[in-house]
């Protein structure tokens, strides 16, 4: 038993009373999200009817989860906080640093050898401060959290953008940067702008080829990659009860791709069944005792337009399978229209690799349904046209799938079973290809499909689909294949149709534990060592405080054009090895961003040398000369993962300001936490006024205050000047972070 019984018992004992108190004070019906949020206020004396999308609120989450790539920087910051133990139950999960190459056994052995210094550091820090530690191979953070820690009505933060996966068990689970996680682990208040709430009413029931993944793929097309920003997506309606807990988790997981703060479902019998199957009967008993407050009030779901900021309806009975992409997860296309899209746009029609897994789709049910299709290859005398890669979500899933014949079904097709880890989904894929720059198509059951993300090739057209559809397209090897109507030719020359996928929601024989890989903290005063000459880890030095003056005559480091995700700002893949070494990882800063003035990546004007150079190299030179710089960008800057390195790297290299048309939620918070200025255009057309050789000043910082605009002054190379207003979302506390140099400096 790794979950925290004492904490859970106390939580449920107090939960009903807290919700009743909220209802009495607010004097109105409550959505599920509101019940959970208000029940987690840091100080009940602060209770009032907060304005959604406007008011900042202090919360007290129940727990923290961290993956190994982001945990390094989070724990380096925590070590500077002067605490002996974490204030809430916390865990570290080693899932990001394992590169997919030869297969699970070999890859885990390589990872342990390659990352020994980092793993030892994370294990020792975890032991020292009372943090649970999950070893490499134990599983993907979000699957392990779902199996062991998530609980209905709870609230958690995680240093990974797909933390909302726990919403599949009715939990408000929010992806954050490491500095936010440190707030929670030190027992401080954790600040969040009160989210708006988007209600999604589900009716009907899935059938045939349609899966829970298709719900969120369709919704991504409706909301786009930023339509859920600063909002919680709350699912309700009779259709929710037809979805398994892991299916719900899939939907919540990919809410990150529309920018949602989190997503969640109401507690129901499917969640109870999953909790019991994973050994948490007592959680079910406690949740059932307060089940009326683990869903929205009846009047809310009866009259949703009066209580949600937006209402979207999806009929599961009419839903088609979807394929989203390429290059963005909101390019949603139903399978009935996909072949036409492939031909019209000239996408590489041949599907070169199918990949099943990731935190989004690696549950027992996912593998069970995909395996039912794999078995048809033998049964119908077919062959598989494309290579298949499978990443189970956890050791528990892998061991159970092996016992129940699923692994054998995949391996019979020549599939490579990779480690229970993230692998290709985050760019940890040593792909073997004849030409790493060739145009090609892959289909995955992952969540993101940004350019270069999976394999580093900008010409890999990555499409996101359900595990079932990924498996079918792998068998066919053809993006234009529609398994709902098309047939394949078998070895006998017969035209055969794939039968609809089937599978069990949960294993009939129960879960196999396998080699779990959990290490409980032993509480001893473990010595933590970081070698001074380490290339993987580096102790942090506090950032300097603001000098009290306006920021004057800053050179433009880069004016980024188009999509600029955290992958563009701080690439993962081969750079993951430097996630604990701020100086080294800063070498990748903004190397993927497109320069608006020349259309190139990692090539910007260096005014100190009057030549072009790399982004990080140019910033380093400015820093060495004591010159701060500024970055300008377009919409939804910082979309994607929660990695705070995308904020810490610019701060480390003396970039003081990011001026964008809009920001992704997590990244904007990360910038604020690191003492940077995150500003937005009042008039987005002012973006076009900024020239390559401009010097930019920020005026008004002496009177920096909530709701008060600042002024940007452009000093053009020809001696002329222009100015325009910019806005911000800083409150008094966040302004204090800026003045102190970072949030950590205010502790």
For each feature predicted by the language model, list its residue ranges.
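Mobile "lid/hinge" segments at catalytic clefts and subdomain interfaces of large enzymes
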Residues: 3-4, 68, 151-284, 382, ...
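Flexible inter-domain linker/hinge segments
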Residues: 5-7, 16-21, 36-42, 46-47, ...
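Long, structured ligand/cofactor-binding scaffold of large enzymes
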Residues: 8-11, 15, 20-195, 579-631, ...
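Active-site-proximal loop->helix
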Residues: 191, 399-409, 665-680
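Acidic, glycine-rich flexible loop/linker segments
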Residues: 488-505, 667-737, 744-746
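Extracellular/luminal Protease-associated
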Residues: 236-241, 624-663
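Accessory "access/gating" subregions that flank catalytic or transport cores
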Residues: 109-113, 118, 123-158, 234-237, ...
């Amino acid at each position: 038993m790794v979950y925290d019984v004492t904490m859970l018992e106390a939580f449920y004992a107090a939960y009903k009373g807290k919700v009743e108190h909220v209802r009495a004070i607010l004097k109105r019906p409550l959505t599920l999200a509101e019940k959970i949020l208000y029940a987690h206020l840091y100080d009940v004396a602060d209770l009032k009817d907060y304005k959604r999308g406007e008011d900042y609120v202090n919360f007290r989450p129940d727990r923290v989860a961290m993956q190994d790539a982001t945990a390094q920087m989070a724990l380096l910051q925590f070590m500077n906080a002067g605490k002996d133990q974490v204030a809430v139950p916390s865990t570290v999960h080693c899932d990001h640093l394992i590169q997919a190459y030869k297969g699970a056994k070999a890859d885990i052995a390589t990872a342990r050898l390659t990352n020994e210094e980092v793993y030892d550091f994370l294990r020792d820090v975890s032991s020292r401060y009372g943090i649970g530690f999950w070893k490499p191979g134990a599983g993907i953070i979000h699957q392990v959290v779902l199996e062991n820690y998530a609980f209905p009505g709870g609230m958690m933060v995680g240093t990974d953008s797909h933390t909302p996966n726990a919403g599949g068990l009715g939990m408000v689970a929010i992806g954050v940067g490491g500095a936010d996680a440190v707030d929670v682990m030190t027992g401080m208040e954790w600040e969040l702008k009160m989210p708006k709430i988007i209600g999604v009413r589900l009716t009907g029931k899935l059938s045939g080829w349609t899966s829970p993944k298709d719900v969120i793929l369709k919704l991504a097309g409706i909301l786009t990659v930023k339509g859920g920003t600063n909002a919680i997506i709350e699912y309700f309606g009779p259709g929710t009860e037809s979805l398994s807990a892991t299916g719900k988790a899939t939907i919540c997981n990919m809410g990150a791709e529309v920018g949602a703060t989190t997503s969640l479902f109401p507690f129901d019998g499917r969640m109870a069944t999953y909790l019991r199957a994973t050994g948490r009967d007592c959680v079910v008993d406690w949740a059932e005792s307060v089940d009326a407050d683990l869903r929205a009030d009846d009047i809310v779901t009866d009259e949703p337009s009066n209580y949600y900021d937006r209402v979207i309806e999806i009929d599961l009975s009419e839903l088609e399978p979807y394929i989203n992409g390429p290059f963005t997860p909101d390019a949603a296309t139903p399978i009935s229209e996909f072949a036409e899209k492939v031909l019209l746009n000239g996408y590489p029609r041949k599907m070169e690799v199918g990949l099943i897994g990731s935190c989004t789709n690696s549950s027992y049910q996912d593998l069970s349904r995909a395996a039912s299709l794999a078995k048809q290859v033998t049964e119908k005398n077919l062959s598989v046209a494309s290579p298949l890669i499978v990443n189970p979500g956890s050791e528990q899933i892998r061991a159970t799938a092996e016992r129940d014949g699923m692994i054998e079904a995949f391996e019979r097709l020549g599939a490579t079973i990779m480690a229970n880890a993230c692998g290709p989904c985050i760019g940890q894929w040593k792909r073997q290809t004849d030409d790493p720059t060739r145009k090609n198509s892959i289909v995955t059951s992952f969540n993101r499909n940004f350019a270069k993300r999976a394999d580093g090739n900008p010409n890999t057209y990555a499409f996101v689909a359900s595990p079932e559809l990924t498996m079918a397209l792998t068998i066919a090897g053809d993006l234009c294949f529609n398994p709902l109507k098309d047939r394949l030719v078998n070895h006998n020359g017969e035209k055969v149709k794939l039968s609809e996928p089937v599978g069990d929601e949960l294993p009939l024989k129960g879960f196999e534990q396998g080699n779990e890989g959990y290490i409980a903290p032993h509480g001893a005063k473990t010595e933590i060592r970081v070698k001074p000459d380490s290339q993987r880890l580096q102790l942090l030095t506090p950032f300097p405080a603001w000098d009290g003056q306006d920021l004057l005559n800053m050179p433009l480091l880069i004016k980024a054009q188009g999509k600029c995700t955290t992958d563009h700002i701080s690439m993962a893949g081969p750079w993951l090895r430097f996630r604990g070494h701020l100086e080294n990882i800063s070498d990748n800063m903004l190397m993927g961003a497109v320069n608006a003035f020349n259309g190139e990546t990692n090539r910007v004007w260096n005014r100190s040398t009057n030549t072009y150079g790399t982004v990080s190299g140019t910033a380093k030179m400015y820093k060495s000369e004591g010159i701060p710089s500024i970055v300008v960008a377009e919409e939804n800057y910082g979309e994607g993962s929660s990695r705070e390195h995308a904020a810490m790297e610019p701060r480390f290299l003396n970039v003081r300001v990011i001026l964008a048309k809009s920001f992704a939620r997590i990244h904007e918070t990360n910038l604020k936490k690191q003492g940077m200025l995150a500003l937005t255009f009042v008039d987005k057309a002012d973006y076009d006024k900024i020239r390559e050789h401009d010097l930019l000043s920020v005026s008004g910082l002496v009177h920096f205050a909530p709701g008060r605009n600042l002024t940007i002054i452009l000093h053009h190379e020809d001696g002329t000047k222009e100015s325009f207003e910019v806005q911000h979302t800083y409150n008094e506390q966040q302004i204090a972070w800026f003045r102190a140099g970072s949030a950590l400096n205010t502790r």
